[in-house]
Amino acid sequence: EGSSVTALSVGAKSVVDNGKLSKDVLSRGPNDLTLVTDDSFVGMLPSQTSDVLAKAAAKIGFDLIFCGQGSDDLYAQQTGLLMGEKLGVPCINGVKSIAAGDGIVTVERELDDEIETLEITLPAVLCVSSDINKPKLPSMKAILGAGKKPVTQWSAADIGYENGTQDVVAESVLAQQQAERLNVIIEGDSDDDINAFAEHL
């Protein structure tokens, strides 16, 4: 009660400044949307993206920031953690559930062989996994109402961001070629069958 949710996105103007995309974001619940656009925001690395997000978030003001675990392009899983570091606030990744308290949040994250429960004070940054919820499709009322919600646009200069020289430049992003399934079926439980099975693992 009394809380407000601001969606924040950064990127090249040609990509982020999209009325249809803004409306889609706002139809899913946020009270308003802030876009930070600049022609130099192309091919940014996590260190740069987190810097822009941190400066914009600091200007907006916040108690709790939610980030995805990773982006669709690089999935480096670094941006949210770097953002928390630059803002000087606690940051937890891999979060699968959240319970809010008075000035604190209790979160759970799944590790290899256990579920870890952590309590952190606000303000904070949380990087959530896909297990956090199952997004619902927005209703027609929400879609129509999204067009009336405010959208703020800032430039890099508005948040005091200067695009410095990159120490590392990503020239390409490659994915391993998907291997074809061999459909090898081994029946039996003899030593030879087990050895043959092991060879195909």
List the predicted regions and their residue ranges:
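N-terminal glycine-rich FAD/FM-binding segment characteristic of electron-transfer flavoproteins
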Residues: 1-201
